[in-house]
């Protein structure tokens, strides 16, 4: 019963600098440096702004910038995901991602970055009564092989749309764990 998995929001951040040759970095605004600083600095949102007792993670999974090792590009594009188990943590982390990206660009003397947050699936909440009834049926059918997963996971699932619509729900996996 309760939270089964996490929310999942996507983000794209495009840092815009001023490209140039690697031999003259002083006449550029390096978006790769901004991207690197953001990747490191955004982790402080998790460690210093999010309640330590709440789940939340920000992952940068893609970085695209430049075409050669001796050329500072004009832009650096980051793509990532923000995951949490509750709306307050989700909101705080989205705010932190946006604020950190803007601050990094400001420190570099660059224009504000282009930030796109894409709302994804909400967390799935299992109905307590339905979970108890269904759990008893699964236990009767599978005996000791039926296991309750005690902690919610970090995966996401659009099944949450049923829950958000008010449908009493119980989400479970069958054969999803090693025997």
Question: Which residues fall in each region the model found?
Answer:
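Generic structural marker for isolated residues within well-ordered, non-membrane alpha-helices
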Residues: 101, 135, 159
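Short, low-order "capping/linker" segments at domain edges
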Residues: 124-137
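Midchain, well-structured core segments that form catalytic/ion-binding scaffolds
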Residues: 1-126, 153-156
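Short, structured loop/turn "capping" segments at alpha-beta junctions
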Residues: 111, 144-145
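Acidic, glycine-rich loop-and-strand cores that form catalytic or ligand-binding grooves
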Residues: 139-143
């Amino acid at each position: 019963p309760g939270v089964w998995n996490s929310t999942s929001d996507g983000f794209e951040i495009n840092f815009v600098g001023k490209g140039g040759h690697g031999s003259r970095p002083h006449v550029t605004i390096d978006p790769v440096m901004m991207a690197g600083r953001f990747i490191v600095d955004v982790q402080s949102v998790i460690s210093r702004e999010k309640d330590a007792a709440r789940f939340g993670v920000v992952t940068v999974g893609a970085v695209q910038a430049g075409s050669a090792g001796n050329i500072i590009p004009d832009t650096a594009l980051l793509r990532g995901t923000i995951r949490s188990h509750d709306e307050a943590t989700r909101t705080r982390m989205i705010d932190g991602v946006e604020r950190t990206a803007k601050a990094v660009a400001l420190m570099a003397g660059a224009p504000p970055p282009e930030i796109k947050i894409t709302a994804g699936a909400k967390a799935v909440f299992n109905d307590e009564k339905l979970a108890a009834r269904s759990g008893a049926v699964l236990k009767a059918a599978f005996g000791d092989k039926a296991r309750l997963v005690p902690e919610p996971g970090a995966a996401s699932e659009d099944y949450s749309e049923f829950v958000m619509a008010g449908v009493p729900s119980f989400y479970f996996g069958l054969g999803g764990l090693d025997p």
